């Protein structure tokens, strides 16, 4: 049933000129400088147009089932990740232990950890540093980070320590994220801004992405981070609009998340990218995914990424289905958002 519905959806998109969107940046040569302009050029060059959005072949399906408790099915072969390793991976892990820093890569048991830390196919080593502690004030059904209504207070020296640590590594791109801190008056936004500013002072050319919580939709908090000097302002909507209340904490919602992204676009310096992500395999339908993409596009978001949800433990929300690589590719080529990236593996 999913196969036929997905194919019909693709044909509808192909025939609808009103939904044709493409990047406004011309493709460039394969080699791009490690700058924000280079990042924008690379994204534009790698993002196909709607004309490349073709039907799935008859022997492909949207997803495969995950089985039941009584009759579990093994992971598909494309979901089996390699064991982490490599010089950069070892170096980053050693430094994290020495400095007692937290990463969402480890806290959330992200299956992409090895590829990101080692540099992957591009050789660009990335890491996602988690600030404001390792305890979240919210409890989303998919997330492995521990929770508490009253987490320990933030370390006032953390922005400087994190900046100095990251500056000493051989990273080209760093993502700074955090747990939700509903217990703090500023939701932790000033901590974010200080960390970005101190890191930029030490490494002006390093690309910095701030993956922030929703700050309860507070415009002042969003503005503070958006004007901190970052290159990419990211906030994840996590899932399609129709599944928000099922998957996310009750204090989060789709409209509030889109509002945060739009406010960031208004306040950030011209050229700053905005980005969001959703998980697939949570029970969503292809129609719901496309509808969500359209609303993300209407909100002016530059980059949207997709990932297969992977259950971090038996206590968490089960995987509904494993979405096939072919289906991921069809979403990527839909061009409903300026730049669409995808990964088969994601944990949060």
Curated annotation (Swiss-Prot):
Q: Which cofactor does it need?
A: [4Fe-4S] cluster
Q: In which pathway does it act?
A: Protein modification; protein lipoylation via endogenous pathway; protein N(6)-(lipoyl)lysine from octanoyl-[acyl-carrier-protein]: step 2/2
Instruction: Write out the residues that bind [4Fe-4S] cluster 2.
Output: 136, 140, 143
- Compartments in which it is found: Mitochondrion
Q: Is Iron-sulfur given among the entry's keywords?
A: yes
Which biological process, per GO, is one annotated for this protein? Answer: lipoate biosynthetic process
The GO terms this record gives for MF are: 4 iron, 4 sulfur cluster binding; lipoate synthase activity; metal ion binding
Homology family: Belongs to the radical SAM superfamily. Lipoyl synthase family.
Instruction: Report what the protein is called.
Output: Lipoyl synthase, mitochondrial
Gene that produces this protein: LIP1
């Amino acid at each position: 049933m999913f196969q036929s519905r997905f194919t019909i959806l693709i044909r509808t998109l192909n025939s609808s000129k009103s939904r044709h969107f493409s990047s406004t940046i011309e493709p460039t040569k394969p080699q791009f400088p490690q700058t924000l302009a280079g990042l924008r050029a690379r994204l534009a060059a790698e993002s196909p147009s709607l004309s490349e959005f073709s039907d799935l072949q008859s022997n492909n399906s949207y997803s495969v089932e995950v089985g039941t408790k009584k009759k579990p099915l093994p992971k598909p072969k494309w979901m089996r990740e390699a064991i982490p390793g490599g010089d950069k991976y070892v170096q980053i892990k050693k430094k994290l232990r020495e400095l007692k820093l937290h990463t969402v890569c480890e806290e959330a048991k992200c299956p992409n950890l090895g590829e990101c830390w080692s540099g992957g196919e591009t050789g660009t080593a990335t890491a996602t540093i988690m600030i404001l502690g390792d305890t979240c004030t919210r409890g989303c059904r998919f997330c492995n980070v521990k929770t508490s209504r009253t987490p320990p207070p933030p370390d006032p020296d953390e922005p400087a320590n994190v900046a100095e640590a990251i500056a000493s590594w051989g990273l080209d791109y760093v993502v700074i994220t955090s747990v939700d801190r509903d217990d703090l008056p500023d939701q932790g936004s000033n901590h974010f801004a200080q960390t970005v500013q101190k890191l930029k002072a030490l490494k002006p050319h390093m690309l910095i992405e701030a993956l922030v919580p929703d700050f309860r939709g507070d415009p002042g908090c969003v503005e503070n981070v958006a004007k901190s000097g970052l290159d990419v302002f990211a906030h994840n909507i996590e899932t399609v609009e129709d599944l928000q209340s099922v998957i996310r904490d009750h204090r989060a919602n789709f409209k509030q998340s889109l509002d945060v992204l739009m406010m960031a676009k208004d306040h950030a310096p011209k050229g700053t990218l905005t980005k969001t992500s959703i998980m697939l395999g949570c029970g969503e339908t292809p129609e719901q995914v496309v509808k969500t993409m359209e609303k993300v596009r209407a909100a002016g978001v530059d980059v949207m990424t997709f990932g297969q949800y992977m259950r971090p433990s038996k206590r968490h929300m089960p995987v509904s289905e494993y979405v096939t690589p072919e289906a991921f590719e069809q979403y990527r080529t839909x061009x409903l958002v300026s730049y669409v990236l995808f990964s088969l593996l994601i944990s949060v």
